[in-house]
């Protein structure tokens, strides 16, 4: 870390207060961790075309403290059920007219289920035994349970985004944030 006078500031603060330097370190670590979460959430939301709020609430931050200067980010990497994207509605498609006696490729006379901003052909809404409503779709090749919940795969984009962003942000922002936090702690100690 190449910050001018950092060692001197740390030494002075350590002489004045025992908790000032660890408090500054914890503050800087927490800021870096929360910015890593928000940047990763934005990147995943852009890639998967899911609202940023839905992605961000899958990450939990256990904040660093004076006694334990480690922040822990826990991410739920499970697939996102489509029903969470927003209101589900059936849109009638009048473009594909069929002749009398022919079966439609899309069941229900050419209607398509739209959830949020996604069109899901051949899907329907059903209440499961656990009481939750989900968007279901028939799955070819599954003999025993031929219907399945429609989900958006999130494991790969979340993993790659968090691994990239955490390392990059730690390199770029931690020294700056540590400097700001030390200055803040110094101001707090001087005010007392």
Language-model features, listed with the residues they occupy:
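Short, Lys/Arg-rich flexible segments
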Residues: 1-192
């Amino acid at each position: 870390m190449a910050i001018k006078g950092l060692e001197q500031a740390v030494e002075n603060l350590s002489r004045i207060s025992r908790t000032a330097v660890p408090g500054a370190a914890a503050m800087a670590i927490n800021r870096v961790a929360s910015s890593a979460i928000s940047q990763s959430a934005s990147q995943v939301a852009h890639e998967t075309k899911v609202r940023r709020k839905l992605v961000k609430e899958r990450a939990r931050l256990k904040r660093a403290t004076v006694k334990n200067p480690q922040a822990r980010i826990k991410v739920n990497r499970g697939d996102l059920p489509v029903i969470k994207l927003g209101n589900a509605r059936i849109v009638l498609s009048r473009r594909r007219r069929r002749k009398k006696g022919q079966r439609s490729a899309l069941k229900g006379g050419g209607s398509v289920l739209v959830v949020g901003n996604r069109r899901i052909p051949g899907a329907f809404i059903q209440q499961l035994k656990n009481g939750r409503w989900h968007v279901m779709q028939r799955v070819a090749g599954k003999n025993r349970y031929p219907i399945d919940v429609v989900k958006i795969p999130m494991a790969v984009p979340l993993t790659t985004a968090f691994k990239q962003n955490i390392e990059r942000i730690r390199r770029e922002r931690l020294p700056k944030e540590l400097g700001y936090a030390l200055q803040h702690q110094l101001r707090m100690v001087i005010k007392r």
